[in-house]
Amino acid sequence: MRVKEQLLTLRAYVPGKNIEEVKREYGLSKIVKLASNENPFGCSARVTEALTSLASQYALYPDGHAFELRTQVAKHLGVKAEQLLFGSGLDEVIQMISRALLHEGTNVVMANPTFSQYHHHAVIEGAEVREVSLKDGIHDLDAMLQQVDDQTKIVWICNPNNPTGTYVEKQKLLSFLESVPKSALVIMDEAYYEYAGAEDYPQTLPLLEKYENLMVLRTFSKAYGLAAFRIGYAVGNTELIGQLEVARLPFNTSTVAQSVALAALEDQAFLQECVKKNEEGLHQYYAFCKEYNVFYYPSQTNFIFLKLGIPGNEAFERLMKKGYIVRSGAAFGIDDGIRITVGLKEENDEIIELLKELVNEQVQKEETYS
């Protein structure tokens, strides 16, 4: 029995190593995971409270339409409930969109590097993938526009971008939306939206009324700290969202996920405190990079991408042996970089000291050979 030919060219998604795996492999008792862009501050206390009230519902199917969560998210965003499509994390939302729109003979346009699942699901559906290299770490919208044609079904824009943490400015996005054919769906993946504080970061929801070929993706996995529960959503025009509902599994978001997302949404004070502490953490890394002349991309997310002057895989291994899990840039095609999730203040302090050691060792090597 053979699967689709295109599946033979792909690899299953490989997440960052988990804590127990690293403990076993390196014989360590303490592990700090800064690899998957999870919220180090956890989630709102209201989530724990919500969980205690769910025991009587475990044997029942969830609300397939996610009515209560849908109603409150719509109110929070200022959109219609019919504009929302919920999924088991944004991974499933991306899968649903790809399944509904793509087939052999169509194409998608995206940056490189960016979130890998856009490429993954396009290949599964038999679509051509047109990748455009980042320009100074940022989506090159002009070059991406040149790749769009009549067969382009989706243009993916990860904003802020994973893995670089950079963002597309408002005016550049508006210019792109004015120029791109209306037959191409422009999807703004805003998984890290809550962390983006730049003045010229585009607010896309108000643009949905003008641009019917625009769609916005957001998640509860990152700033809300609910990665374990898997819930994300798309916001778009009601007609397209209604059509995409056909591709959604009947009970794709659990009662537990819906309940905790609703609880987290209600605690905006906790969210804002997390965002504030994350900004402080980023500045810890900025100070290190400036003092040690380390290249980095200014970030609008809860992670930072930097280059230490050594291969990313080497930095990854050496940090892991010390109990710190990060992501090697090699996973994204940037062999000389690493991506580090912003952690608690003390975690940032500790790993920065290790980064200093790596940089100093490299400087000494270069001086020896010069």
UniProtKB/Swiss-Prot annotation:
Record GO terms (molecular function): histidinol-phosphate transaminase activity; pyridoxal phosphate binding
SUPFAM superfamilies per the UniProt record, alphabetical: PLP-dependent transferases (SSF53383)
Pathways involved: Amino-acid biosynthesis; L-histidine biosynthesis; L-histidine from 5-phospho-alpha-D-ribose 1-diphosphate: step 7/9
Record flagged with keyword Amino-acid biosynthesis: yes
PROSITE patterns: AA_TRANSFER_CLASS_2
Keywords of the record: Amino-acid biosynthesis, Aminotransferase, Histidine biosynthesis, Pyridoxal phosphate, Transferase
Catalytic reaction equation(s): L-histidinol phosphate + 2-oxoglutarate = 3-(imidazol-4-yl)-2-oxopropyl phosphate + L-glutamate
Requisite cofactors: pyridoxal 5'-phosphate
InterPro entries the UniProt entry points to: Aminotrans_II_pyridoxalP_BS, Aminotransferase_I/II_large, HisP_aminotrans, HistidinolP_aminotransfase, PyrdxlP-dep_Trfase, PyrdxlP-dep_Trfase_major, PyrdxlP-dep_Trfase_small
Keyword Transferase found: yes
EC number assigned by the record: 2.6.1.9
Gene3D superfamilies referenced in this protein's UniProt entry, alphabetically: Aspartate Aminotransferase, domain 1, Type I PLP-dependent aspartate aminotransferase-like (Major domain)
GO biological process, one term: L-histidine biosynthetic process
Residue positions where N6-(pyridoxal phosphate)lysine is found in the record: K222
Quaternary structure note: Homodimer.
Family: Belongs to the class-II pyridoxal-phosphate-dependent aminotransferase family. Histidinol-phosphate aminotransferase subfamily.
Stated name of the protein: Histidinol-phosphate aminotransferase 1
Gene: hisC1
